[in-house]
């Protein structure tokens, strides 16, 4: 049950408000940079409008800033950098890159002192029963390094919270392919409901879990589920109301936007897939050699993962078959574990989750539970927190969000037609609601950039974005279209030259290619090529700002939890290595009914 140690102290609401006040003061000047759409970089003279410095000096200053130490303790006050030194008071243009970078670094989650160390929290939750995840759980056996890192770190924390609060039931919202859910049930013997809006994900998770259970004992015969006998103690099936699995129709799947690999809203943002801080690159070659989802700015939860099982677990090689046949011990382990797990303790369900969802309609045998989410997309993360605060059965929550660009904003003009009492993704807390604060889609999109993976000064792959920005100029000048509603998509990777890129793009957009000759197209390219460094420098400014936008979103969620009377403890925890998993912060909260030591 509960650990003897009290949970770590966390910042109170007045302290968080002070942090927010300083952050908002900085963002009022800096938000214009994050909000600028790089597709319009040349058509709207973005560099000239927002930056009063040559691009070479900006890039040089950011390179130097990247290797500087963290802000000194004496500089950590809210007024350590006067804003007029960063931005011009009259034109609002950026004047000092050094001050800009230093202030942005100061207002990151980590440097503001908002995080509760994960080791400290685990020690408090587990007390004298501290047990790390078995070292024999090798990443290669299940998934790629990134996903394995996330699942193992989060599952240990979830199990510790469940033990601390005396909970056996876990609800995994936005469960996707079921990696976390399967691990929680098989490794820790927890009763897990994995809820996703996509029938495809649900059926895939069921099949994957079925195969995994058959082979689990062969690879991990000493899991907690076997050791404590939980699986065999629960002969009953998980109860699911009839028809729940069929709720994930095409409309709800599209509304949820979960697992959609075709999102085109990120056109015009740089592809940073080949970048990482130079020092980290040497240490993390095995990580960066994999496809990087989040810094590509496509769906952060639409991971390109290998199957959950080892490659040879489904189709063993001949030598492995012989070894298995010769090993009576392995056969016995496999048969014993198979009998113990005849009743599944992981049930994938299909349902579209909102803040107003009635859990009893989805889970028939709902009991006191812990609600979790690993990289829950857009509004699903704030909805998870609202369900936690409003449903008596949900005693604790552990949520890692992603896809900030898909959040709905209450004070964004484009949403005027929505109901006033609707649950918005941002803001959640009273402080930001009173400020009527709005980030805007482009700023939220820039918050998805991964600063830790970007090598300052190492040469960003900005050519694709440069192509798109110059194309926009051609479209404006020759077709009279100042705002193109259609998206070009991933044409750049299919083209060998700017000329081919323009031709393919115009065709996709349904524009008459004959209006622009080859000579005209190449003239545009040659005229703007010397200004490509402006685009590179501007993108780096956006990357440096990205953690500040994320800090604002996370602070909003933490403040919301602090405002709730029924919440006894809440915190931000840096759960993952940001190089492996840029969306690394978990929002955690426990209700007063939990024993807090």
UniProtKB/Swiss-Prot annotation:
Its EC number is 2.1.1.-. GO terms for molecular function: methyltransferase activity. InterPro entries: Methyltranfer_dom (IPR025714), METTL25 (IPR052220), SAM-dependent_MTases_sf (IPR029063). Residues 245-254 have a biased composition (Basic and acidic residues). Pfam families: Methyltransf_32. The keyword Mitochondrion does not apply. Residues 245-265, 317-342 are annotated as: Disordered. Transmembrane segments: none annotated. It comes from the Eukaryota. Coiled coil: none annotated. GO terms for biological process: methylation. Keywords: Methyltransferase, Transferase. Residues 317-326 have a biased composition (Polar residues). Probable methyltransferase. This is Probable methyltransferase-like protein 25. It comes from Mus musculus.
């Amino acid at each position: 049950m509960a650990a003897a140690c009290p949970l770590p102290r966390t910042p109170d609401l007045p302290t968080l408000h002070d942090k927010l006040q300083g952050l908002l003061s900085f963002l009022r000047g800096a938000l214009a940079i994050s909000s600028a759409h790089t597709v319009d970089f040349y058509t709207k003279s973005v560099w000239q409008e927002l930056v009063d410095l040559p691009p070479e000096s900006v890039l040089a200053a950011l390179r130097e800033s990247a290797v500087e130490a963290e802000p000194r303790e004496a500089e950590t006050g809210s007024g350590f950098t006067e804003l007029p030194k960063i931005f011009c008071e009259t034109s609002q243009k950026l004047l000092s890159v050094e001050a800009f970078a230093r202030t942005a670094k100061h207002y990151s989650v980590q440097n503001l002192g908002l995080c509760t160390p994960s080791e400290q929290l685990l020690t408090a939750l587990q007390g004298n029963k501290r047990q790390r995840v078995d070292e024999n759980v090798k990443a290669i056996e299940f998934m790629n390094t990134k996903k394995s890192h996330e699942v193992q770190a989060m599952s240990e924390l979830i199990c510790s919270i469940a033990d601390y609060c005396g909970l056996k039931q876990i609800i995994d919202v936005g469960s996707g392919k079921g990696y976390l859910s399967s691990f929680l049930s098989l490794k820790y013997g927890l009763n897990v409901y994995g809820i996703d809006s996509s029938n495809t994900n649900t059926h895939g998770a069921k099949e994957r879990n079925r195969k995994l259970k058959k082979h689990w004992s062969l690879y991990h015969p000493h899991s907690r589920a076997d050791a404590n006998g939980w699986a065999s103690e629960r002969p009953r099936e998980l109860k699911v109301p009839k028809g729940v699995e069929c709720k994930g129709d095409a409309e709800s799947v599209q509304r949820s936007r979960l697992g959609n690999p075709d999102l085109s809203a990120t056109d015009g943002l740089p592809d940073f897939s080949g970048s990482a801080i130079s020092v980290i690159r040497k240490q993390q070659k095995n990580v960066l050699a994999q496809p990087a989802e989040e810094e590509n700015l496509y769906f952060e939860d639409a991971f390109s993962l290998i199957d959950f099982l080892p490659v040879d677990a489904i189709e063993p090689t001949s030598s492995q078959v012989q070894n298995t046949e010769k090993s009576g011990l392995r056969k016995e382990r496999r048969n014993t574990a198979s009998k113990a797990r005849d009743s599944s303790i992981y049930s994938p369900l299909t349902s579209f989750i909102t803040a107003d969802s009635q859990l009893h309609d989805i889970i028939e045998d709902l009991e006191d539970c812990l609600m979790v989410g690993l990289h829950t997309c857009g509004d699903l993360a704030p909805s998870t927190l609202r369900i936690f605060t409003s449903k008596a059965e949900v005693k604790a929550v552990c949520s890692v969000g992603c896809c900030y660009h898909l959040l709905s904003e209450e004070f964004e003009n484009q949403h005027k037609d929505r109901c006033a009492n609707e649950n918005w993704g941002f803001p959640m807390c009273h402080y930001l609601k009173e400020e009527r604060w709005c980030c805007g889609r482009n700023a939220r999109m820039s918050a998805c950039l991964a600063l830790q993976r970007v090598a300052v000064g190492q040469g960003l792959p900005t050519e694709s974005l440069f192509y798109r920005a110059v194309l926009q100029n051609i479209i404006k000048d020759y077709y009279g279209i100042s705002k193109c509603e259609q998206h070009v998509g991933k044409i750049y990777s299919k083209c060998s030259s700017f000329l081919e890129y323009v031709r393919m793009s115009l065709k996709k957009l349904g524009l008459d290619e004959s209006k622009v000759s080859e000579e005209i197209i190449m003239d545009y390219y040659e005229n703007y090529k010397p200004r490509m460094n402006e685009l590179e420098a501007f993108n780096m400014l956006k990357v440096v700002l990205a953690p500040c936008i994320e800090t604002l979103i996370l602070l909003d969620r933490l403040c919301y939890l602090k405002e709730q009377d029924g919440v006894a403890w809440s915190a931000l925890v840096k759960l993952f290595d940001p190089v492996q998993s840029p969306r690394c912060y978990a929002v955690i909260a426990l209700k007063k009914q939990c024993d807090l030591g």
